[in-house]
Amino acid sequence: MLHNVSKGVVYSDTALKGQDGDREGMWVGAGGALAPNTSSLFPPEPPGASSNIIPVYCALLATVVLGLLAYVAFKCWRSRKQRQQLAKARTVELGDPDRDQRHGDSSVFVDSPHGLEPCIPSQGPHADLGCRLYLHIPQQQQEEVQRLLILGEPAKGWQGLAGQLGYQAEAVETMACDQDPAYALLRDWAAQEGSGATLRVLEDALTAIGREDVVQVLSSPAEGCSVV
């Protein structure tokens, strides 16, 4: 019986030694160091493979960051250029303040009269009468002119005079809503034209619409009026 037990122990030792031999077969000694056996089913990654991927990732990340920075810089440059163009256009548009003051709101008020020559004083005892400004004649004379312009048909009234003075139809419609449209017309014309709103210009426009009666009122000197 002892013989059989010893025999079993020998077999066990032999089996264990065989398993150890199989395990050792997976590693090959090289200079005292163990290296993996290349005949394995799943060969391990070569040493340093993971460290070689890191520079690639860093290069890709740097490329993405540089692309974003370039895009932001381009957008900022383009936005600044557009603001400069808008500011330049606004400067050109507002570069003539005298023009805006002279014409006012172009959608309502008058354009410059066409074909009207500047006032040139003529010779004679009343040489300066034609060059007098409408606003410089007496108030009573102005009111009489306005009263006559309200009477009669529109073509020969203040509407026709407005057309002769260069007003557009929409401006005439706006003035028609005023309580005294003739007064509004002559006041606006005198304010817009300034030194050009002379009696000669007004008389020429009245003659063109056949209102010689109003011309006579302008030509007749009023009592107690001093020539300016």
Swiss-Prot record:
List residues traversing the bilayer: 53-73
Say where the protein is mainly found: membrane
Keyword Signal attributed: no
GO annotations of cellular component type? cell body membrane; cell surface; lamellipodium; membrane; neuron projection membrane; nuclear envelope lumen; nucleus; plasma membrane
Pfam families linked = Death, TNFR_16_TM
Which residues does the record list as glycosylated? 4, 37
Found in which tissues? Detected in embryo, including embryonic brain. Detected at very low levels in adult testis, spleen, thymus and lung.
Kindly state which keywords UniProt assigns to this record, in alphabetical order: Apoptosis, Cell membrane, Glycoprotein, Membrane, Nucleus, Transmembrane, Transmembrane helix
Q: Write down the membrane topology.
A: Single-pass type III membrane protein
Q: Residues on the Cytoplasmic side?
A: 74-228
Localization of this protein:
Cell membrane; Nucleus
Q: What post-translational modification information does the record give?
A: Isoform 1 is N-glycosylated. Isoform 2 is not N-glycosylated.
Q: Which GO terms describe its biological process?
A: apoptotic process; in utero embryonic development; Rho protein signal transduction
Give residue spans on the Extracellular membrane side: 1-52
Name all Death domain ranges: 143-222
User: GO molecular function terms here?
Assistant: coreceptor activity; death receptor activity; nerve growth factor binding; neurotrophin p75 receptor binding
Instruction: Say what the protein does.
Output: Modulates NTRK1 signaling. Can activate several intracellular signaling pathways, leading to activation of JUN. Promotes translocation of SORT1 to the cell membrane, and thereby hinders lysosomal degradation of SOTR1 and promotes its interaction with NGFR. Both isoform 1 and isoform 2 promote apoptosis.
Q: How does it assemble?
A: Interacts with NTRK1. Isoform 1 and isoform 2 interact with NGFR. Interacts with SORT1.
Would you tell me the protein name for this molecule? Death domain-containing membrane protein NRADD
Q: What is the lineage of its organism?
A: Eukaryota, Metazoa, Chordata, Craniata, Vertebrata
